Amino acid sequence: MEINKIIEINNNNNNNNNKIIENNNDNKKIIEINNNNNDNNKIIEINDNNNNNIKDKILKKENKDSILMKPPPIFITPANKDDTITVFHQGHIISIPRKLKINLKSITDCGPDGVMFRAKNEDSKEEVIVKKISVFLMKDDKMARKLLRNLLFQRHFQQHPLVSTFQSVFKRKSSENYLISNKNNRNNVRLPLLQQKGDDDIYFEYLLPEFTLLQMIHNKLLTEYNIMIFLYQLLTVVKFMHSAGVIHRDIDPSAITIDQNQCLKLTEFYFCFPSNCPVDLFFNDYDTSSFIYRAPETIWRNTTYTTAIDVWNIGVIFGEMILGKRLFKTQDFEDHLISISKLIGNPTAEDLSIVLSKSIFQYMEKIPKSTLTPSVGIKRRFKGASKDQIELLQGMLCWDPRKRMTIDQLLAHKYFSTIHDESMQIKCNEIFNLKYYPDFYKMKSDLVKKSIENEFLTPC
């Protein structure tokens, strides 16, 4: 089979004209972000009582002649339905609609499961992110179900102001044969994944975020007030999810956006799990998620799971906001459990009483013994944290999920006394369930694809 010619694009992004202005009198830093429109540069003020220099700029300016691509046309016609082009970017070959005015720097992320672009919606005049889903993902049963699940949860939680969901969903047919090279599979083997002419490309449109929480953390842009308000917002939106009978399982700061009004939003729900589903399905696809934010009991593979999983997850993110860097840097479950023990000491016999796996129990027994207590370990790691922050960390980062503070207890803590707002603690008006998908975890990719097309495609 003939593979069409690859167009290689240069991806140098050396220019960066964002300005950082320090105002020592007001103890603020002002980041002026050039957004390719000299009349509308964005000004973001960030409180900085410590008056530290910003080590890295968050946003990289595009060239002045950059052209944001337009989203796929709303109306499909014989003239545009097959109008695509193939390009090469970061080791991946990607199909994109030919009439979209693609500029190299509009590509923001690329992987074997899809590619993301910055774009401008010509109808709303808003800057958006458009994600093209790889056909490879849609041909894998488990990956396709994960995509559908994300859409189902986004739709269910879209009423909450701290949830960011898709604006529209489009489908186009590929006009060319091309390869998608998967560099990051489990065996680290580079596999060519062929997409053929006529295969469907699915595009999702989202509002373009100002920042992600991960960017704010790693660039040390968070003030004490930022940390407090973001933690409070995160707790309230997760409480909303819990009220719908849903455990998030995979809260990641890279999937949490922040706008200029200091409003946090969750954007991804791929690993969310309804608490009313059978326990044997809980780990069906969970092994593919990162270990960095996972609670110990998810590694121990307990036969029960609770909302305390998310409390641990949020606790890790809270710790990262305080530190300005990763709390754990682990790639496998063994290393992760050792890293946890270095932070809060070894689990007690009572903590290990919930471990039912003999092999896991034996492994935990082999972890180097330590006299470190959770209190001492957390105080040692978070030397600059306040007393209230230490109390919250100790209440969230516990081996035993039964000993962790609940979301309600955390929200009622005195740490939030100056911003406490009951009106933010809303409940979902409907319990989430998969009643329309009784065999969801057995669905094949072709059926998943039909479900997405029937339920989520934007009418043309």
From Swiss-Prot:
Disulfide bonds: none annotated. The keyword Zinc does not apply. Its EC number is 2.7.11.1. GO terms for biological process: intracellular signal transduction. Keywords: ATP-binding, Kinase, Nucleotide-binding, Serine/threonine-protein kinase, Transferase. Residues 102-416 form the Protein kinase domain. Pfam families: Pkinase. The active site is at residue 250. GO terms for molecular function: ATP binding; protein serine kinase activity; protein serine/threonine kinase activity. GO terms for cellular component: cytoplasm; nucleus. It catalyses: L-seryl-[protein] + ATP = O-phospho-L-seryl-[protein] + ADP + H(+); L-threonyl-[protein] + ATP = O-phospho-L-threonyl-[protein] + ADP + H(+). PROSITE patterns: PROTEIN_KINASE_DOM. The keyword Nucleotide-binding applies. ATP binds at residues 131, 154-162. This is Probable serine/threonine-protein kinase kinase DDB_G0280557. It comes from Dictyostelium discoideum (Social amoeba).
